Design a protein with these regions (language model features):
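The feature captures the beta-strand-to-loop junction immediately N-terminal to the Walker
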Residues: 49-51
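Helix-to-loop junction immediately C-terminal to a conserved catalytic motif
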Residues: 64
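Conserved ABC transporter NBD signature motif
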Residues: 72-88
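Short coil-to-helix segment of the ABC ATPase nucleotide-binding domain corresponding to the Q-loop/switch region
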Residues: 105-112
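Conserved ABC ATPase "signature" region
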Residues: 116, 122-140, 192
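Conserved signature/switch motifs of ABC ATPase nucleotide-binding domains
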Residues: 143-146, 164
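Catalytic Walker B motif of ABC-type/P-loop ATPase nucleotide-binding domains
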Residues: 169-172
Length: 271
């Protein structure tokens, strides 16, 4: 298969969510984002890739309604607008950089939290059991976070994000602090979940290698103030496994994405 990026993949239908000219200026005057345009379609696995501080996490928080844009708009397929009070209406799950588990609560109680906040009491226990089974923690419902490894804590965090059966899963560098073996294992588990559940995923990462392995589409961002520099399609079939990671296609895509990232950084420094 020839390795080639496309500048903008052709996707049909109304996006699940679209950022139109979004800008974000913080109270201290720092401009994190400027003229950010991004459309995410149903069932996509999209990664946001860029240098530290380019606004990737800020963009994710704006999509989730945890931060309001200073300029531009966030448009949803249902015509609504997200904020911290209405995220549930858009069925969003959010996985943060750290597991952020309540240390005094069991794994099951941590996973139950989004159900409580959304007022979803019916079949709560069954939902929790199903979410834990999906991430390989079926036998750890009554364990406490202190009893889990770093990878298991992140699995619990993913289960918590999945328990409300969100249509859109937002993930902010969830595996960055893990060792490479655990990270690769969780990459595979995440892809298996995505393929079986057909969620829409927006994934933030600093890693070229991780973005190529996971994504259908990679959005490369400029340094702060962040905007889209280019988009690349990874035209490799799923499921992906170790054979893809050791293939010439994978190496070629990594070079292309690395070159695009270097060009984005250069463009930002020259602006």
């Amino acid at each position: 298969m020839p390795v080639h990026p496309t500048a903008s993949p052709t996707l049909s239908g109304t996006p699940v969510v679209a950022l139109d000219g979004v800008g974000k200026t913080f109270a201290n005057g720092m401009v994190a984002l400027e003229r950010l345009d991004l459309a995410v379609h149903a069932g996509e696995f999209v990664s946001l890739l860029g240098p530290s501080g380019c606004g990737k996490s800020t963009a994710l928080r704006i999509i989730a309604g945890l931060s309001a844009p200073s300029r531009g708009r966030v448009a949803w397929a249902d015509g609504g607008a997200a904020d911290a009070r209405t995220v549930g209406a858009h069925r969003i799950g959010f996985v943060f950089q750290e597991p952020t588990l309540m240390p005094w609560a069991t794994v099951a109680a941590n996973v139950r939290l989004p159900l409580r906040l959304a007022g979803l009491k019916a079949d709560a226990s069954a939902r929790i059991d199903a979410a834990l089974a999906r991430v390989g923690l079926a036998g750890f419902a009554q364990s406490y976070p202190r009893e889990l490894s770093g990878g298991m804590k992140m699995r619990a965090s993913i289960a918590r994000a999945l328990v409300t059966e969100p249509a859109l899963l937002l993930m902010d560098e969830p595996f960055a602090a893990l060792d490479e073996i655990t990270r690769f294992r969780l990459n595979n588990d995440l892809l298996a979940l995505w393929q079986s559940l057909r969620k829409t995923v927006v994934f933030v990462t600093h890693s070229v290698f991780e973005s190529v392995y996971l994504s259908q589409r990679i959005v490369v961002m400029t340094p702060r103030p962040g905007r889209v520099f280019t988009e690349l399609t990874i035209d490799a079939p799923f499921p992906r496994d170790e054979s893809f990671r050791t293939s010439a296609d994978y190496a070629g895509y990594c070079r292309l994405v690395s070159d695009a990232l270097a060009a984005a950084i250069g463009a930002g420094e020259g602006s």
